[in-house]
Regions:
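Short helix-initiation/N-cap motifs at beta->coil->alpha
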Residues: 36-38, 87-98, 220-231
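Flexible loop/hinge segments that line or gate small-molecule binding clefts
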Residues: 79-82, 118-150, 280
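A short, structured surface patch at a secondary-structure boundary
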Residues: 53-103, 107, 112, 214
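Extracytoplasmic ligand-binding site segments that recognize negatively charged/polar headgroups
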Residues: 117, 133-146, 184-205, 250-253
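Structured C-terminal subdomain patch of bacterial secreted/periplasmic proteins
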Residues: 149, 242-313
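Bacterial Sec-exported substrate-binding components of ABC uptake systems
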Residues: 2-8, 19-57, 155-186, 247, ...
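Alpha-helical, coiled-coil/dimerization segments enriched in small aliphatic residues
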Residues: 75-78, 194-226
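Proline-aspartate-enriched helix->loop->beta-strand connector
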Residues: 97-99, 104-110, 127, 232-245
Length: 313
């Protein structure tokens, strides 16, 4: 009886030991992990080695946390030599899928608003894909955090975030004692002129700096629209201190649109901002789309134009 009892105990101990070993092996051999960006959870490779990137805005953030990629999108912007050397897959909104699939990536990073149309084809080829809803400056820190966790470079991401947030704070602190400027942010394209809401990049930076966006007084409730119709008549009634103009498209087409909608009308010359030479045309590179890690520099530019205050980093 005693031998039988001892044998049973030994058998139980062996089973438990084997179960424990099995559990450890399963955990250590996991090939995926779950990461979250802005409330959305994604399943990604545990240690991706071949990351194909379809958006250069995401690419710059990836390299900021010491990540590496195997592709980029076409661009006319000057890139660092390391990024320039990457295979270009076509325009951001028109990716060459044959070339992308040929890279044999173990993860693809893109944007919901540009690359959703490719998702089913990537899934059919069993390629893990993350499509970010990455748009405004509020998304920059979450993006750095996500990419740091993705590449297992969390400490680098934290360091970059600390510098980024410190520079943002430095710009905002410089304006604390200023009377808020009344600002209109116009969006000029070849098709016409509209006004930016706080959902747009430049207007969101204006808000962060405590300036008053005059278009806000014309909006009923909240809106997800980045731009809204805005006439010269309304602009004349608002008569802001400063007019920021964000451009998109060819210069000659933009000039023509501005003349038709605004500058050829005699009322334009009567605007306070025009008379005080405070109509500022902003470069699209920093002010049309999310400037990413250059957000502090973009905000410092707005601060300089509005208040004459220089902030350096």
């Amino acid at each position: 009886m005693k031998k039988l009892l001892l044998g049973s105990i030994a058998l139980v101990m062996i089973v438990l030991a084997l179960a424990g070993c099995g559990k450890t092996t399963s955990s250590s051999s996991a090939t995926t992990k779950e990461l979250t960006f802005n409330g959305q959870t994604y399943t990604v490779p545990k240690d991706p080695q071949k990351i194909a990137v379809l958006s250069n805005s995401v690419l710059s953030m990836l390299y900021a946390v010491d990540g590496k990629a195997i592709s980029r999108a076409n661009t006319t912007d000057k890139l660092a030599p390391e990024l320039e050397a990457l295979p270009a897959l076509g325009q951001t909104a028109n990716i060459n899928m044959e070339q992308l699939l040929g890279l044999k990536a173990d993860l693809v990073l893109g944007l919901v608003n540009q690359h959703k149309k490719y998702e089913s084809q990537l899934q059919a080829n069993n390629i893990p894909t993350v499509l970010f809803d990455y748009d405004g400056i509020k998304d920059n820190v979450p993006m750095l955090t996500f990419l740091g966790e993705l590449t297992n470079h969390q400490d680098k991401a934290k360091s970059v975030i600390t510098t980024y947030e410190s520079n943002i704070t430095k710009v905002k602190d410089a304006v604390k004692n200023q009377q808020p400027a009344r600002v209109a942010v116009l969006r000029a394209t070849g098709k016409g002129v509209t006004a930016e809401t706080d959902e747009a990049v430049t207007a969101s930076m204006v808000k962060e700096l405590g300036m008053t966006n005059v278009v806000a007084s014309h909006l009923e409730g909240t809106t997800k629209d980045k731009t809204v119709p805005y006439s010269l008549e309304t602009l004349t009634a608002d008569n802001p201190d400063i007019i920021f103009v964000v451009t998109m498209g060819k210069e000659e087409e933009i000039t023509k649109a501005m003349k038709q909608a605004m500058t050829d009308n005699p009322a334009w010359a009567n605007l306070k901002a025009v008379q005080n030479n405070r109509v500022v045309y902003l470069p699209s590179k920093l002010f049309l789309l999310n400037p990413g890690l250059q957000t502090p520099e973009a905000m410092a530019r707005l601060l300089k134009e509005a208040y004459g205050i220089d902030v350096t980093f």
